[in-house]
């Protein structure tokens, strides 16, 4: 467990440390329900929120506003803030760690134009993410969250709670990233556009309602466990361009086998 209190200083309800002439908030120890993180402490800009900074004493917080001075939000920063319903990110936030909203009540989140990196984005599946139109790194169509890359888009996550049964992945997508659809309970049909060349590990694992997926010519790689536990899958036609079929990509599904379910090689 993190314990850096020997190097911490206290200001109001915040324990912090100084790093490169800026402030890193290490711990919040207040009792407010509506928290506005300060942009400055003792004349220095607040740049970072440390991992799990609000996790210990934040169970009753309902709303948090992060100022534009903050560029980095650490892993699990608001984890276990069980009453948290709203997280407001101002322009300036660049990087957001993993498990930031684990065990919170947040269902919607707006990503400003400055956000450039989400760590483990598939963990955001229960949150409806709205992305600033001018953001150069991500966009959302209301269901899928995409990362913009030099060679096209990567679908990095879909909304786990969305009850739609059909989805067409955005054109210009080249990669379906690992865990992107994992555990989505409702989706039955997915169409991948021409240009998708790779489906990464566990991308559709445990999509137990998935019946049909269109795999385009040009697809070269299906990684390990991609369709594992897709027990409703009725058939799968593998394109002629496929070069790499990962371990357990279409097997190891509680007795389900390619020959029984119309897999065509």
Predicted regions and their residues:
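Structural signature of tandem-repeat unit edges
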Residues: 13-22, 29-47, 58-72, 82-95, ...
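Gram-positive cell-envelope targeting signals
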Residues: 1-5
